[in-house]
Regions:
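N-terminal soluble domains immediately following signal/targeting peptides that reside
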Residues: 21-188, 194-201
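Bacterial N-terminal signal peptides that target proteins for export
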Residues: 1-8
Length: 203
């Protein structure tokens, strides 16, 4: 934790209020923040939550040492999470894990633009845990602070747009739902054409 060690007291202080019940595996927090001219992401939850997800996604006995466990946590994080700003995917640089009863994953964020117009966040690290709730806080210089929840209801994903200095949540429709709506529209048009043809034939 050499890189993020100097920032840990700040993050620990912020998260202490957000996740006082962090020993519950269905609760987690994600923060996007700035420190020392750089942008970072931090995810915090109970160690048991990380353990449950790793054992579910891989298998029991997938790791034998803390280092192997940390590597799997980082791999799982990179598979299950993403951040898109102004349409560009942000890279997670040098992710690290601080193990404890309350375990934290840190990553530096690459090339966050100065003028942020939109943001899409997904954090499904704990998506396999029943009733999983992730509290998200965005606190970056030059933009309003935003706080919201990621749950199974929004598929652990949120889309936001900055309008007149205020964050607006955008409805994120699932591709299957979009396909279903499109299919219904096309079917309705097709049926309408058939009825119209039938009407002409009748007269």
């Amino acid at each position: 934790m050499q890189i993020y060690g100097r920032y840990f007291p700040l993050i620990a202080l912020i998260f202490s209020g957000l996740i006082a019940q962090a020993h519950q595996p269905d609760l987690s927090s994600l923060m996007i923040y700035e420190q020392g001219g750089k942008s970072f992401l931090a995810i915090k939850s109970a160690l048991s939550a990380f353990e449950s997800e790793i054992e579910y996604s891989y298998h029991k006995g997938a790791y034998k040492t803390p280092t192997e466990f940390e590597e799997l946590v980082i791999e799982h994080f990179q598979k299950k999470s993403f951040l898109v700003v102004n349409g560009d995917t942000i890279k997670f640089l040098n992710p690290q894990v601080s193990l404890g009863h309350e375990t934290t994953l840190f990553a530096e964020l690459s090339e966050i633009p100065n003028d942020i117009e939109s943001m899409q966040i997904k954090n499904a690290i704990f998506g396999d845990i029943s009733h999983s709730i992730c509290e998200v806080i965005i606190t970056l210089n030059g933009i309003p602070q935003k706080q919201f929840l990621l749950t199974s209801e929004n598929k652990h994903e949120a889309m936001l747009r900055l309008e007149n200095g205020t964050w607006v949540m955008i409805e994120n429709e699932h591709p299957l739902f979009i396909f279903t709506k499109s299919a219904l529209i096309i079917s309705s048009i097709f049926i309408g054409i058939l009825l119209l043809i039938a009407g002409w034939a009748f007269f």
